[in-house]
Swiss-Prot record:
Protein name per its UniProtKB record: Cold shock-like protein CspB
GO molecular function, one term: nucleic acid binding
Pfam families: CSD
Xref: PROSITE patterns: CSD_1, CSD_2
Gene assigned in the entry: cspB
One GO CC annotation: cytosol
Species, as recorded: Yersinia pestis
InterPro entries: Cold_shock_CspA (IPR012156), Cold_shock_domain (IPR050181), CSD (IPR011129), CSD_CS (IPR019844), CSP_DNA-bd (IPR002059), NA-bd_OB-fold (IPR012340)
Amino acid sequence: MSNKMTGLVKWFDAGKGFGFISPADGSKDVFVHFSAIQGNDYKTLDEGQNVEFSIEQGQKGPSAVNVVAL
């Protein structure tokens, strides 16, 4: 599943390097790891930030990939 989606960052713990995104379509919150964030800056997200992402099935369930801040 590589369809691009948008959503809001529900929360992100920069110290632990992960958080969750609430998809705009109302589907279940999606796990996001800092390594999935695109960009050259410090890879973190802010609560309430708009993002675009795709979903892939990981070992522990669906996770966001190719996350881009909007």
